[in-house]
Amino acid sequence: MDQYSSSLVDTSLDLTIGVTRMRVEEDPPTSALVEELNRVSAENKKLSEMLTLMCDNYNVLRKQLMEYVNKSNITERDQISPPKKRKSPAREDAFSCAVIGGVSESSSTDQDEYLCKKQREETVVKEKVSRVYYKTEASDTTLVVKDGYQWRKYGQKVTRDNPSPRAYFKCACAPSCSVKKKVQRSVEDQSVLVATYEGEHNHPMPSQIDSNNGLNRHISHGGSASTPVAANRRSSLTVPVTTVDMIESKKVTSPTSRIDFPQVQKLLVEQMASSLTKDPNFTAALAAAVTGKLYQQNHTEK
């Protein structure tokens, strides 16, 4: 049987075409890679924390260095310049002075002084604004108000709320007298001039000065008025001064309460004349002056 089987021919068909079998190599295990990745991530995180801590320490050191430098500068400045003398709290806001080597130096800035001065000027102007109404003729188209003072016109313009133009005047004694005046016709009544004054005059009226000078010339020309009489005359001239409040009251809103300046001037003249006639010294001086004048005229005619 064994011999028979060995003598048989192997008739099996080999279907392979000569291609060798390929062995598929398996990948290494991924656990090692995952472990390496975790290690690198942990190292990066640790480095980031160290860098953050280093930045914080740098900022703290830098802040301490700046504080030390500032303190050093302040100490050096205090050693070079002596301490300033502290003034009272009331005047501390206005200015503070430090005396260095006998020379006074003001530590307040020019801007602060300018603002304080401007605020004071505005306060004074607001407190001294007055308005006066003057009655004029219907045919009078000028904006001239005769209030006893001399003015200089420096401008004129038309406003939106009034068809009549507004004229601007300043005192003829400027810049020593800073009073200003605005004149414009009333919207309700075109025959009424509204004069707005800003400030107060620091000098008497020119008309009063002229009248006083005329009386002085009259009495001195007579030659018989003594010094006490002249002193009494001057005192009598200064007594009957009547102050007229020309400031418009806030309660008056209509142009019915107006002040006629010629009537006020007439009242002042009457009061002055009555007070002068009641003074016996002035009467005697006036009589002596008139007598001396008549005597000189008669002597000249002869």
From Swiss-Prot:
Gene3D superfamilies: WRKY domain (2.20.25.80). InterPro entries: WRKY_dom (IPR003657), WRKY_dom_sf (IPR036576), WRKY_plant (IPR044810). Disulfide bonds: none annotated. Signal peptide: none annotated. Pfam families: WRKY. Its main location: nucleus. SMART domains: WRKY (SM00774). Residues 140-206 bind DNA. It is found in: Nucleus. GO terms for cellular component: nucleus. Keywords: DNA-binding, Nucleus, Transcription, Transcription regulation. GO terms for molecular function: DNA-binding transcription factor activity; transcription cis-regulatory region binding. GO terms for biological process: defense response to bacterium; defense response to fungus; negative regulation of DNA-templated transcription; regulation of defense response; response to molecule of bacterial origin; response to salicylic acid; response to wounding. Belongs to the WRKY group III family. Transcription factor. Interacts specifically with the W box (5'-(T)TGAC[CT]-3'), a frequently occurring elicitor-responsive cis-acting element. PANTHER family: WRKY TRANSCRIPTION FACTOR 36-RELATED (PTHR31429), WRKY TRANSCRIPTION FACTOR 40-RELATED (PTHR31429:SF3). This is Probable WRKY transcription factor 40.
